[in-house]
C-alpha cells in the first residue's frame, strides 16, 4: 500500500497523463496553443485542490472549487475562464456529463472599457517612431483588430481593391473580413516600401523572419503612451475598444460592429452601448475622420 510521499508521486504521474490528454484533445479540436496551456494550468489547479482521481470527479467538485475561488475574491471573468477549462476537461477529456444548473457561469461584472479619444489616437501614433509598430497600431484601431490577429496577417490578406482585410487567425476560430482604412493603408504602404517589402508574413520578426509575438507590440505601445504623456492604463486592446466606440458615435448599427469585431454573441458587443446608438449611415473607419473629436 502506498503512503505519504509515494502516494504523492503516484498521483503526480496520474494527473500528468490527464493534463497531457488535454493537449491531445485540444489539438484535435484545433484549439490554439495558448488556450490549451490555459486549460492545462486551470485543470492542474483544480486537481490539486480536489485531490481525487479524475475518474471519480463530480460536478459538485467543480462547484466547490469555483466557490472557493469566488470566496477568495476572484472576478467573474476569472471564474468563467476556470469554468470553461473544467467544462472542456469533464466533457471532452473525461467523457463526463456537465450540469450547467449546478455549476453555472458567473454573471460578468463588465467594466466600461478604456476608450481613447480621436485626438489621443493621433498623439499615440505620432509618438510611435518605429514604422512597423505604427502600422500595427493604425490597423488595430482603424479595423478593430486584436493584437493576435494583426501580428498574424500576411501580405495576401490585404485587399487594396476591396479595401478589406481577411482575418484568419481569430480568437473565435471564425474567419471574417475587416474594413481597411485609407489612412491605415497609406501608413502600411510606407512601412512596406521602407521595411523590406515583405511578401509573406506582413510583420515578420526582423531576426527570425517568423511571426512577431504579442510582447513586442505591447512594449512599443507602452513606450509610445509614455512619450505621448497619455494615461498609463492604456493597453493594446484599448485600440479595439476605441474603434467600436467611435463607430457607435458615428451612427453605425451595433449588429454591424459585432460582425466587424468578430463577436459570436451580441452580448460581447453590447458593452459599448454606454454611448447612444443611432441609425446605420454607412461604415467608414473612424481613422479616416480627422478632427471633430466627439469623445473628449
Regions found by a protein language model. Give the residues of each.
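Short, small-residue-biased leader/transition segments that mark boundaries at the very start
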Residues: 2-9
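Conserved catalytic core of the tyrosine transesterase superfamily
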Residues: 10-296
Amino acid at each position: 500500500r502506498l503512503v505519504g510521499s509515494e502516494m504523492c508521486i503516484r498521483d503526480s504521474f496520474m494527473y500528468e497523463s490527464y493534463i497531457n490528454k488535454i493537449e491531445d484533445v485540444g489539438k484535435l479540436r484545433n484549439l490554439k496553443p495558448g488556450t490549451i496551456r490555459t486549460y492545462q494550468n486551470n485543470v492542474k489547479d483544480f486537481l490539486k485542490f480536489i485531490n481525487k482521481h479524475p475518474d471519480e470527479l463530480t460536478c459538485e467538485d467543480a462547484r466547490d472549487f469555483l466557490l472557493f475561488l469566488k470566496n477568495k475574491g476572484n472576478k467573474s471573468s476569472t471564474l468563467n475562464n476556470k469554468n470553461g477549462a473544467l467544462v472542456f476537461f469533464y466533457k471532452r477529456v473525461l467523457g463526463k456529463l456537465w450540469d450547467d444548473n449546478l455549476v453555472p457561469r458567473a454573471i460578468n461584472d463588465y467594466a466600461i472599457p478604456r476608450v481613447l479619444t480621436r485626438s489621443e489616437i493621433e498623439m499615440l501614433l505620432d509618438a510611435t517612431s518605429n514604422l512597423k509598430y505604427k502600422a500595427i497600431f493604425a490597423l488595430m484601431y482603424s479595423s478593430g483588430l486584436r493584437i493576435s490577429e494583426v501580428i498574424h496577417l500576411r501580405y495576401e490578406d490585404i485587399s487594396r481593391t476591396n479595401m478589406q482585410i481577411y482575418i484568419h487567425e481569430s480568437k473565435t476560430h471564425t474567419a471574417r473580413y475587416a474594413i481597411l482604412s485609407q489612412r491605415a493603408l497609406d501608413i502600411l504602404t510606407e512601412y512596406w516600401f521602407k521595411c523590406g517589402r515583405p511578401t509573406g508574413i506582413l510583420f515578420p520578426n526582423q531576426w527570425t523572419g517568423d511571426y512577431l509575438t504579442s510582447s513586442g507590440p505591447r512594449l512599443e505601445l507602452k513606450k509610445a503612451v509614455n512619450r505621448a504623456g497619455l494615461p498609463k492604463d492604456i493597453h493594446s486592446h484599448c485600440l479595439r475598444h476605441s474603434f467600436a466606440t467611435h463607430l457607435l458615435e458615428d451612427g453605425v448599427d451595433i449588429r454591424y460592429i459585432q460582425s466587424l469585431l468578430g463577436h459570436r454573441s451580441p452580448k460581447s458587443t453590447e458593452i459599448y452601448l454606454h454611448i447612444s446608438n443611432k441609425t446605420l449611415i454607412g461604415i467608414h473607419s473612424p481613422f479616416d475622420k480627422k478632427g471633430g473629436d466627439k469623445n473628449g
